[in-house]
């Protein structure tokens, strides 16, 4: 199996997974042309489109792809008006490319957000990013916390295939909270180098995210003051505070 990331709109990722038979699955197609060009170059035949949620930067290529390739579209109920032909829900299993893709419901960024998991890949849309997480446009902080906790239950070698290249910004925020954390500062240097050479930081291994992502694994970090006191409350309360701080963070 081969995984390709297609960068669009400066920081969006479209994911394309294909096998030796040149059949492929397209995840969150935010546009058509880039995908068409890759498929033509590699002689790939799309057999399915996966949608994680309904935002335009993840669905704008769907109708053109359906028309050109006559491809079925799997997605949550919220994506029906954007071309979904097969609605998915928690626990559904999709058998394609001789693999099983399991559906996870991940409310938070949107209420109907889902992810698709087939080891080692987890296509999580805008729920989890490297060193960060998505904004709460529809769901609550509690919703998002438990969605991320669900992702954190996966094996450490899981590869997080997120929808945006926000790693450096996320690390800058994390370092503002933990300025003396050497793991964060060292990884930031690596990310800066990747950014300089226009290389992606994704997919990212879950075991790495457990070291650098304060939203995924807050109890792995030494909080002080008000944040430390929040550790004594329900688990999601600290997550909400961090998300609020991130919303107001100036890069």
UniProtKB/Swiss-Prot annotation:
Q: Which UniProt keywords apply?
A: Hydrolase, Metal-binding, Zinc
Enzyme Commission designation = 3.1.2.6
Q: Which residues bind Zn(2+) 1?
A: 53, 55, 109, 126
How many and how are cofactors bound here? Binds 2 Zn(2+) ions per subunit.
Please list the GO terms describing molecular function.
Answer: hydroxyacylglutathione hydrolase activity; metal ion binding
GO BP annotations of the record are:
methylglyoxal catabolic process to D-lactate via S-lactoyl-glutathione
Q: Which reaction does it catalyse?
A: an S-(2-hydroxyacyl)glutathione + H2O = a 2-hydroxy carboxylate + glutathione + H(+)
Q: Which domain of life is it from?
A: Bacteria
Assembly information from the UniProt record:
Monomer.
Q: Which HAMAP family match?
A: Glyoxalase_2
What this chain does, per the record? Answer: Thiolesterase that catalyzes the hydrolysis of S-D-lactoyl-glutathione to form glutathione and D-lactic acid.
Designated name of the protein: Hydroxyacylglutathione hydrolase
Species this chain originates from: Wigglesworthia glossinidia brevipalpis
């Amino acid at each position: 199996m081969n995984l390709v990331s297609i960068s669009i709109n400066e920081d969006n990722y479209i994911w394309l997974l294909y096998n030796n038979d040149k059949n492929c699955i397209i995840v969150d197609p935010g546009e058509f042309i880039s995908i068409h060009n890759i498929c033509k170059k590699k002689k790939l035949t799309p057999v399915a489109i996966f949608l994680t949620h309904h935002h335009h930067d993840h669905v704008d290529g769907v109708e053109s792809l359906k028309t050109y390739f006559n491809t079925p579209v799997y997605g949550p109920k919220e994506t029906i008006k954007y071309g979904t032909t097969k609605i998915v829900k928690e626990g559904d299993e999709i058998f394609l490319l001789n693999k099983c893709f399991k559906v996870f419901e991940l409310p938070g960024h949107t209420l109907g957000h889902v992810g698709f998991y087939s080891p080692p890949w987890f296509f999580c849309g805008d729920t989890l990013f490297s060193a960060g997480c998505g904004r709460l446009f529809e769901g609550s902080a509690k919703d998002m916390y438990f969605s991320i906790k669900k992702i954190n239950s996966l094996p450490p070698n899981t590869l997080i295939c997120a929808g945006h290249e926000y790693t450096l910004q996320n690390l800058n925020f994390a370092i503002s909270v933990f300025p003396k954390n050497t793991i964060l500062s060292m990884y930031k240097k690596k990310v800066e180098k990747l950014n300089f050479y226009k290389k992606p930081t994704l997919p990212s291994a879950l075991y790495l995210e457990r070291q650098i992502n304060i939203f995924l694994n807050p109890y792995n970090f030494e909080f002080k003051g008000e944040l430390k006191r929040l550790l004594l409350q329900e688990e999601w309360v600290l997550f909400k505070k961090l998300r609020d701080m991130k919303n107001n963070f100036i890069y």
